[in-house]
């Protein structure tokens, strides 16, 4: 791969939108500390599979559900070296509506950060800056894409989550995308 991949999730959501605006491809996913540098003896199998695919091909063709969900680490100290994460078997994706298969490029990120792009309650100037520089993609840019949403450890209240979804609806996102993937919340 000749291009250097930009990887990350959650706190890097705005970075992804900014880099996309200037034409640089990004990959929403693996973060350095919790994924690439997993403290157990090896990287988690699901993470390793997609990380290696990205590094060898420069893209990720198909996202399949993990059959296992892992508890997030609360401590990244030396005592955690070689300690496996608690795991639980799952049945894969949970389909809420529509077809279980859809395709398109992924666009989205942490719903908390996306909310901040529209709402000034946390950062008063954020919505103005995002509008001024066109950081949030226009409705046409969402056409045929897959909206990816995940939540932060702040565990957004249901009313705020609903408001965030309403911002996306008002921006025409749901009418334009080919599908929506929502990450499993932490804990």
Role assignments for model-derived ranges:
Residues 106-158:
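Oxyanion-binding "anion nests"
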Residues 7, 146-150, 181:
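Structural motif
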Residues 2-21, 25-33:
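Short, acidic/small-residue loops that bind anionic groups at enzyme active sites
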Residues 3, 143-144, 175-177:
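A general structural motif
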Residues 25-112:
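Conserved anion/nucleotide-ligand pocket segment
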Residues 10, 14, 46, 105-113, ...:
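Conserved active-site and cofactor/substrate-binding residues in soluble primary-metabolism enzymes
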Residues 151, 155-187:
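C-terminal active-site/capping subdomain that shapes the small-molecule cofactor and substrate pocket
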